[in-house]
């Protein structure tokens, strides 16, 4: 039987774990933790240790209001959900931790892909990640979690994400060539019109917010 232990991690240790985890993402970093702490949310960095090594982790949030207290793990926890023993231990510990905090419920948003598809929406072969992660979903259900279902449309948590495979692409020319003809035309047209990309400074964030709002109103979302 494997020996696990729940530990509290430093922000630095958590960032290091997240940076090397297959499902690591911005929501599971100390930067996101500082942002949420600034909003008055209680933040903790929890991890599972096995044989001296951190094998799972979570930026654990406790939200408190006059009406209720609840716990959230955005885009996590970071865990190998196909490892049933590890998943059962970590989720059980997190549920107990949430209960000790007085939470009425705990919401998690695992970042692990359920099933990989090609650019046309078809499922990839099983050896390329196309096999649905039904076992992982069932493990979480058996632990008391309720799955929100495979929704579509603009939701707070997008069910579908598109990632560009950059394997074999070494420069801008080969990247452009990897897209279809219509996309190539759009990119070349934007370049001919003087459109370019640059990083905004913090003093320009309102410009981004205004553009985002205008786009939302124009696109009706």
Language model features with spans:
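Conserved active-site alpha-helix within GNAT-family acetyltransferase domains
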Residues: 113-150
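Conserved donor-binding loop and adjoining core beta-sheet/short helix segment
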Residues: 34-128
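Hydrophobic, Leu/Ile/Phe/Ala-enriched alpha-helical segments that form helix-helix packing faces
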Residues: 18-21, 94-98, 140, 190, ...
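Acyltransferase donor/substrate-recognition loop-hinge adjacent to the catalytic core
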Residues: 1-9, 56, 136-221
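Alpha-helical elements of Rossmann-like donor-binding domains used by nucleotide-donor carbohydrate transfer enzymes
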Residues: 13-16, 89, 93, 207, ...
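N-terminal charged segments
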Residues: 6-51, 58
């Amino acid at each position: 039987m494997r020996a696990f232990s729940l530990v509290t991690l430093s922000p630095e240790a958590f960032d290091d774990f997240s940076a090397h985890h297959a499902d690591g993402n911005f929501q599971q970093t100390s930067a996101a933790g500082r942002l949420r702490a600034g909003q008055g949310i209680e933040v903790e960095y929890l991890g599972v240790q096995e044989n001296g090594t951190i094998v799972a982790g979570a930026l654990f949030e406790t939200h408190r209001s006059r009406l209720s207290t609840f716990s959230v793990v955005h885009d996590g926890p970071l865990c190998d959900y196909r490892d049933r023993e590890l998943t059962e231990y970590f989720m059980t510990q997190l549920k107990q931790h949430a209960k000790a905090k007085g939470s009425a419920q705990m919401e998690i948003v695992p970042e692990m892909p359920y099933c990989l598809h090609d650019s046309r929406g078809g499922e990839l072969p099983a050896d390329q990640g196309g096999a649905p992660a039904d076992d992982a979903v069932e493990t979480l259900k058996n632990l008391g979690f309720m799955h929100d279902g495979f929704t579509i449309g603009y939701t707070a948590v997008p069910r579908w994400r598109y990632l560009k495979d950059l394997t074999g692409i070494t420069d801008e020319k080969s990247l452009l060539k990897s897209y279809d003809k219509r996309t190539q035309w759009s990119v070349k047209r934007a370049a001919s019109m003087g459109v370019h990309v640059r990083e905004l400074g913090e003093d320009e964030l309102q410009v981004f917010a205004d553009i985002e709002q205008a786009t939302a109103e124009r696109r009706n979302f």
